[in-house]
Regions:
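Positively charged, low-complexity terminal tracts
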Residues: 1-90
Length: 90
């Protein structure tokens, strides 16, 4: 389990994503996003997987913060070098 709080949770209606984090968890998420942005700036497609311990990871917390929401055990963040993202692939 990470020494910070960071969860991604889907609302009961599954139409809204909630990100819960303490200061350290949000800083970790910012570092991941910053690293992906650097790759995208360099013209490279890159991604990162964030997972709970239950899914053999250590990046996400395992305890949902909203009892009505569904905890996501894996989040994949993709960085794209163009605005079109996957739609710009040959």
């Amino acid at each position: 389990m990470p020494d910070y709080l960071l969860t991604f949770e889907l609302s009961k209606d599954r139409d809204e994503l909630f990100i819960h984090g303490n200061a350290a968890g949000l800083r970790y998420l910012a570092r991941v996003a910053s690293r992906l942005a650097e790759h995208a700036d360099g013209g490279r497609r890159e991604h990162d997987h964030l997972m709970t311990e239950e899914w053999a990871g250590h990046e996400l917390s395992s305890v949902a913060q909203d009892p009505a929401a569904s905890l996501l055990n894996q989040v994949t963040i993709r960085g794209w070098p163009t605005r079109g993202g996957a739609h710009d692939l040959p």
